[in-house]
């Protein structure tokens, strides 16, 4: 079976689409603002290029050298114990688990796009009740919106690499950027609010950098790039020949950082312009705090709300698509079935899990859909973010650093980096990255 190849720009935008997600709006800006401003950004950049960049190239090499799905690539490349190594490829199941609850959240965004065409709630308590109602009492809306997002994501993946995933990202990623630029221009007109947002994000406070903040930055740098669940090797298997792997990786990382900073400027301009809580984070920042601020602008606020939630929709869908593709690609190649048939199997599994996630927040069924005292939604989030992704990332990095021939890696990357730089990269891959990932995993587990 011949791989369907991305174009060079298609690969960069598809990988950037996977990396740019909802966390760029509600996690990255808050972490920057509350942990030293530009001091945190400098730390984040250093860790991204010292750790995440190294691990990203390692996963890229599995797909590029294996030229197949993650399971088959590991089997092909492993010098011995091929079956055992190929089984580690099933960490890609983590991707479809993530997709199941991630699409529920994108469904909330879809609901808020609809709500943004009507007068918005300016009272924080009322806005909070509106959001809580969607989660715990409005089952029909939650299921309908999740179902619509589910259909959009699976339709895009069903069209394949070129006609589906690449075309989606070539359209959505520039559109996301244009929407953010338009919102930034409006934010500039808000004077003092924009100045305070810029200071909040960019004025360095190095005294805020503690070991705890370093680990937060390390976790953000690492897992914002979709590592550990087979997305990178799967996309890399469809790379065109003679692609500059270093340049492509740098482009993906920089796009991810740029979108996060732009989101932060937009979000915190509104926060500071109206004196809202700058320490708010997570879904509450987006679905409660920002909604009340948009409401204060009247019709202009409605327009801004629609643009903002559409930008989040684009970011969410491109990420969700990347989570479905690895397992679909595996089923198509392994069992020689059609892409649509593979997606039928995956879709049934993902849809059921998504419904379970919705029911775990619904007031009448929450107790029946809990795991170890957590809502099923939260349990899936914990399993994938704190266990599957870190372990998968360690396994893939160890495989490349200790099981692949060093010269094979140099032949792959040598045209794009000098020997000295390659040796530094290889050292970091073998000795620094595994320790860093273990530190992240221990920190995240301890925090839970």
Residue ranges of model-derived segments:
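Membrane-interface "cap" regions at the ends of multi-pass membrane proteins
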Residues: 1-26, 55-60, 64-89, 240-244, ...
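Loop-to-transmembrane helix boundary motifs in multi-pass membrane proteins
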Residues: 10-12, 18, 143-144, 255-261, ...
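C-terminal membrane-solvent junction of multi-pass transporters and transport-like membrane proteins
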Residues: 87, 92, 335-347, 379-437
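Helix-loop-helix connectors at the membrane interface of multi-pass transporters/channels
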Residues: 2, 72, 106-137, 236-242, ...
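Membrane-embedded translocation segments of transport machinery
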Residues: 2-5, 166, 170-317, 341-342
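Select transmembrane alpha-helical segments in multipass membrane proteins
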Residues: 6-15, 40-43, 82-96, 143-147, ...
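Transmembrane helix-boundary motif of multi-pass solute transporters/channels
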Residues: 7-47, 236, 246-250, 254-255
